[in-house]
Amino acid sequence: MRAAVYHGVGDVRLEDVPEPQPGPGEVKLRVAYNGVCGTDLHEVFDSQRGIPSAPHPLTGAMAPVILGHEIAGTVVDAGAGVDGFDDGQLVTVEPMWHCGECEWCRTGDFNVCERLAFHGMSTHGGGLAEHTVVPAYTLHPTPPGMTATEAAMAESLAVADHGVVRSGARPGQRTIVLGGGPIGIGTMFGLQRRGVEVVAVVEPSPARRAVLAQLGATVIDPGEGALVDQLDGRHVDITFETAAAPASLRNALFVTRPQGLVMLVAAPREPFPPVLNLALIKELEIRATFAYHGEFPGVIDAIASGTYQLDSWVTTRPMTQLHQAFDQLRAGEGLKILIDPSV
């Protein structure tokens, strides 16, 4: 089968590889779509941080690996001990493999497992391939009528939703989202469906601001002046930093009220600047969030019900255009691209 194999920074090859077969407790999928994630772009263009160069302690995987963790696919086969899935059933994948034995797994906090592995990074075969094999516990069946493109969006939107859950945001609080990419949009959606006010989404790209406006967001260009000034001098209770950029973190510290909360929802490409003295002076709480923990079902329901609007910012490409998709997203063009590995 054809797959996108990561050999190192700047070296992703479309190769013919053996088709995987499921072992006990595993399910084989025919991949319909796999989304390109910002994490993939970091690995491809910047540095090899999440893909191991030595055998992973849980999976034994190391580079070269097949990329891809934002997966929608249909069930093809199942290994011994797997029940509850039908051939051809559309599912989405929660791509965290966990040990089930450490302190965090025993309390259900699988996203901080001591030996956590991410499918498509620290496992042998990810979703940028015609077929992939995953543990049955990672699968979420989709409701009737959900499309494969919608199902492939569940992972990235669950990342955003976990940040909203971790923040404890509630109606009556003022929030702002810094960064209008997929995680920023998902954060806005997650806040809105909980009745929390999003005073603005901050985004420097005119094209992305146009999409956000179509989605009903109040949009701010950070180049037009201090955020507080653009908000008529009013600070916010909670800031969601989803751009993972040093300038954006600086803006987050300034726009948040004293004793407010700054949520770090995205992983930075470069170290954040030493501006935390402002957090000290304002007694800010800075809280990080990683992946997800129980958000998939709610996100799937929100997508299926039409609460989350996807049509205006999600596009599809064939696998033959994978490198063009990498370059386009790296340049800040487009928002979310889903890859069809079959073409």
Residue ranges with predicted function:
Residues 35, 79, 96, 243-244, ...:
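Short glycine-/small-residue-rich Rossmann-like dinucleotide-binding loops
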Residues 47, 204-205, 268, 292:
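Residues in the short beta-alpha loop(s) of Rossmann-like NAD(P)-binding domains
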Residues 57-69, 97-178:
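NAD(P)H dinucleotide-binding glycine-rich loop of Rossmann-like/cofactor-binding domains
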Residues 137, 144-224:
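Mid-domain Rossmann-like dinucleotide-binding core that forms the NAD(H)/NADP(H) cofactor-binding site
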Residues 167, 171, 194, 210-285:
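Glycine-rich cofactor phosphate-binding loops and adjacent beta1-alpha1 units
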